[in-house]
From Swiss-Prot:
Record membrane topology: Peripheral membrane protein
InterPro entries in the record: Aldolase_TIM (IPR013785), Alpha-hydoxy_acid_DH_FMN (IPR012133), FMN-dep_DH (IPR000262), FMN_HAD (IPR037396), FMN_hydac_DH_AS (IPR008259), LldD (IPR020920)
Annotated function: Catalyzes the conversion of L-lactate to pyruvate. Is coupled to the respiratory chain.
Location of this chain's protein in the cell: Cell inner membrane
Active site: H275
Family per similarity comment: Belongs to the FMN-dependent alpha-hydroxy acid dehydrogenase family.
EC number: 1.1.-.-
Gene3D superfamilies given in the database record: Aldolase class I
Protein name (record): L-lactate dehydrogenase
Main location: membrane
Residues that bind substrate: Y24, Y129, R164, R278
Domain (FMN hydroxy acid dehydrogenase): residue spans on this chain: 1-380
Keyword vocabulary terms for this entry: Cell inner membrane, Cell membrane, Flavoprotein, FMN, Membrane, Oxidoreductase
Length: 381
């Protein structure tokens, strides 16, 4: 099929990737209301067009935690990313590296830290959950440091997993899931060969290395469910702050008071995120949550925003709402599932071109120029 926009990759991935993996990325929790609002709330934000300004020298680059980024975005941590393309985390990391943006490796990646880090030139970021098994956390941090990971992304909005009903229907979970996945592989032969056969082993690389045995896809949800820690508090993060010398970002902030706590804690950044609508359904979209958080802590801590970003215009919207940078999750997974590394590189090119158009027609030469004034206050119309 013809790919003319990043959204086309979703349809391409739906055709190529078996349902149990496509819907794992595409779906949200419960009735998926927050998942829908993440997208619609961004779409409904109007940009303020300004013309007859000299926009011949336009710059989308930023500096974040001492790193130069070609555009204000980071590839977000996505679990089991290696099931969307052969050794998918490596391909996505190489695409990000080639386009000058960071890649964040998930705790529950298929490819382990030691496989991904040597495949790229720039340091990758590493994402970690708060888990009951503190030994695993310490081991993961030590390995991330040894591999040269530059920034730690600490996900705090998963003390318990959300209920993802769509996974029950698709075969990711639910009755007869194993045989349903096998049958789906027969109807998706290219994926079955490229990922199912050539992409082995299908284990959680970081977990398997620590456990000394293979932890596969069937163990994935069970292992996470058993290890999520509902007793987590800011105090539990103190030993990590002492252990990790580099930048530390707290992911999963939706309330200004939590953002202030992150500043007091000494975090270097936060990610305003509802986990892509995959945790508590019914919470605010990131676009709605972002402005009051920016009012509370802008300038005291770096603000990254994710959830609902589907094009370069959405990145500009998030920046105008108060973010310093953004994270892309589903957008790059669709591209990865559809066309591997090349797909992710092309998707990033598309996003950057769309940013150029939006910045030109809102008369913002640099990322620092993008302020709330780039938006139209529809309540006054």
């Amino acid at each position: 099929m013809i790919i003319s926009s990043a959204s086309d990759y979703r349809e391409a991935a739906r055709r190529r990737v078996p349902p149990f993996m496509f819907h794992y990325a595409d779906g949200g929790s419960y009735a998926e209301q927050t998942l829908a609002r993440n997208v619609s709330d961004l779409e409904n934000i109007a940009l303020r067009q300004r013309v007859l300004k000299d926009m011949s020298e336009l710059d989308t680059s930023i500096e974040l935690f001492g790193e130069k980024l070609s555009m204000p975005t980071i590839l977000a941590p996505v679990g089991a990313c290696g099931m969307y393309a052969r050794r998918g985390e490596v391909q996505a990391a190489q695409a990000a590296d080639n386009k000058g943006v960071p890649f964040t490796l998930s705790t529950v990646s298929i490819c382990p830290i030691e496989e991904v880090a040597p495949a790229i030139k720039r340091p990758m970021w590493f994402q970690l959950y708060v888990l009951k098994d503190r030994g695993f956390m310490k081991n993961a941090l030590e390995r991330a440091k040894a591999a040269g990971c530059s920034t730690l992304v600490f996900t705090v909005d998963m003390p318990t997993p959300g209920a993802r009903y769509r996974d029950m229907h698709s075969g990711m979970s639910g009755p007869y899931k194993e045989i349903r996945r096998v049958l789906q592989g027969f109807t998706h032969p290219f994926w079955a060969y490229d990922v199912g056969i050539k992409g082995k082993p299908h284990t959680l690389g970081n977990v398997s290395t620590y456990m000394g045995r293979q932890i596969g896809l069937d163990d994935y949800i069970g292992w996470l469910t058993e290890n999520f820690d509902p007793s987590i508090s800011w105090k539990d993060l103190e030993w990590i702050r002492e252990f990790w010398e580099g930048p530390m970002v707290i992911k999963g902030i939706l309330d200004p008071e939590d953002a202030k706590d992150a500043v007091r804690f000494g975090a270097d950044g936060i990610v305003v995120s509802n986990h892509g609508g995959r945790q508590l359904d019914g919470v605010l979209s990131s676009a709605r949550a972002l402005p009051p958080i920016a009012d509370a802590v802008k300038g005291d801590i770096k603000i990254i925003a994710d959830s609902g970003i589907r094009n370069g215009l959405d990145i500009v919207r998030m920046l105008a709402l108060g973010a310093d940078a953004t994270m892309l999750g589903r957008a790059f997974v669709y591209a990865l599932g559809a066309a591997g590394r090349q797909g992710v590189e092309n998707m990033l090119d598309i996003f950057k071109k769309e940013m150029h158009v939006a910045m030109t027609l809102t008369s913002n030469r640099t990322i620092a120029d993008i302020k709330p004034e780039a938006l139209v206050d529809l309540s006054k119309l």
